[in-house]
Swiss-Prot record:
Protein name stated in the entry: Sulfate adenylyltransferase
InterPro entries: ATP-Sase_PUA-like_dom (IPR025980), PUA-like_sf (IPR015947), Rossmann-like_a/b/a_fold (IPR014729), SO4_adenylyltransferase_pro (IPR020792), Sulfurylase_cat_dom (IPR024951), Sulphate_adenylyltransferase (IPR002650)
GO BP terms in the entry: hydrogen sulfide biosynthetic process; sulfate assimilation
Matching NCBIfam families: PRK04149.1, sopT
Keyword Ligase: no
Family: Belongs to the sulfate adenylyltransferase family.
Ranges annotated as spanning the membrane: none
Entry keyword Zinc-finger: no
Sample GO molecular function, one term: sulfate adenylyltransferase (ATP) activity
Length: 386
């Protein structure tokens, strides 16, 4: 087995820093999430997409989780503009894509159309409730979409995360240099606690390497900030993982909280990065109680292994069992739940913010120390600026 073939067969490259911008007069302002999508399209992370979806592909993705050519794609990647802006631009024109006064790309406008946002919400997020963070963002966006291929002309400033940003072409090269033929991807927006460590190491028993690929794009306000999480990942890998079997790189996309649909999307993107396998745990990309615990695993049954092109690895909820004296899951542990050390993410965040160290059976002490220090420093800065 060798590294996965990019989704759709070819790794898309829409990067052209020499693109002639001088003649372009029209421009479209991007949101932070759209800017991330622009860069991920341009570097091939979203292969086979070459731009923001036109109406036919948009409708197909929303309704069938496929592009019009049949390729699996579960999340609509769209560019929204106001009705006023839509009147200023036309199909056939090329517009600059701007963020905070800087031009990051251009779009060859093929189509300007009005989406059915309620339908998009119900099919992609399984709800149209505005308290769902993904749905709320959807309805906060303007009501007109612009579709067409893009060209990426400028890269975003990666700041302190710069050493951990890798385009798909780079990760593929690194994996090959490490001698890895099989690579398992792990997506997270949370710190890695013992349960995550356990399933990652279970997966590492059957593949050559682990690609730990935390999301550092937009998340919910109560999620642990990315800079603090990154420090916690580094201390965990330094102390508890074999250095030649793990690769840490960030994923700059915004979190959609689309549960099952987002699990498919996350798998396809990791396939483009070179992964042959992808870990899907309980309630992947979920929020609240909108999705069933294992819906994100069941959704993979809608597709054949050939059209996915990446092997999903499904894991049950894991925990430390005081009776087993080790990490386990309901598949391997026969004991009553009273022997299981289980803490909710909300409870853990509360403990960390209060300076309380979660039990070592739940979180590595080095990781907890980094999280407590980071959160308390952030709280102190926030308090001083009020």
């Amino acid at each position: 087995m060798s590294l996965s073939i990019p989704h759709g067969g070819t790794l898309i490259d829409r990067w052209n820093p020499s693109y002639p911008l001088d003649t372009l007069t029209k421009e479209i302002e991007l949101t932070n999430a759209e800017l991330s999508d622009l860069e991920l399209i341009g570097t091939g992370a979203y292969s086979p997409l070459t731009g923001f979806l036109t109406k036919e592909d948009y409708d197909s993705v929303v309704e069938t989780m496929r592009l019009t050519n049949g390729t699996v794609w579960s999340i609509p990647i769209t560019l929204a503009v106001t009705e006023e802006k839509a009147k200023e631009i036309s199909a056939g024109e090329t517009a600059k894509l701007v963020y905070n006064g800087e031009v990051y790309g251009v779009i060859d406008i093929q189509e300007i159309y009005q989406p059915d946002k309620t339908k998009e919400a119900l099919l992609v997020y399984k709800t149209d409730e505005l308290k769902h963070p993904g749905v709320r963002k959807l309805f906060e966006k303007p009501n007109v979409y612009v579709g067409g291929p893009i060209t990426l002309v400028k890269r975003t400033d990666k700041g302190r995360f710069a050493p951990f940003y890798f385009d798909p072409a780079e990760t593929r090269k690194r994996f090959a240099e490490l001698g890895w033929n099989t690579v398992v991807g792990f997506q997270t927006r949370n710190p890695v606690h013992r349960a995550h460590e356990y399933i990652q190491k279970c997966a590492l028993e059957i593949v050559d390497g682990l690609f730990l690929n935390p999301l550092v794009g937009e998340t919910k306000a109560d999620d642990i900030p990315a800079d603090i999480r990154m420090e916690s990942y580094q201390v965990l890998l330094e102390n508890y993982y074999p250095k030649d079997r793990v690769f840490l790189g960030v994923f700059q996309a915004a979190m959609r909280y689309a549960g099952p649909r987002e699990a498919i999307f996350h798998a396809m993107v990791r396939k483009n990065f070179g992964c042959t396998h992808f870990i899907v745990g309980r309630d992947h990309a979920g929020v609240g109680d909108y999705y069933g615990t294992y819906d994100a695993q069941k959704i993979f049954l809608n597709f054949t292994p050939e059209e996915l092109g990446i092997t999903p690895l499904f894991f049950e909820h894991s925990f430390y069992c005081t009776k087993c004296e080790g990490m386990a899951s309901t598949k391997t542990c026969p004991h009553d739940p009273k022997y299981h050390v289980v803490l909710s993410g909300t409870k853990v965040r509360e403990m960390l913010r209060n300076g309380q160290v979660p039990p070592s059976t739940f979180s590595r002490p080095e990781v907890a120390a980094v999280l407590i220090k980071g959160l308390q420093q952030r709280e102190a800065v926030t308090s001083s600026t009020r």
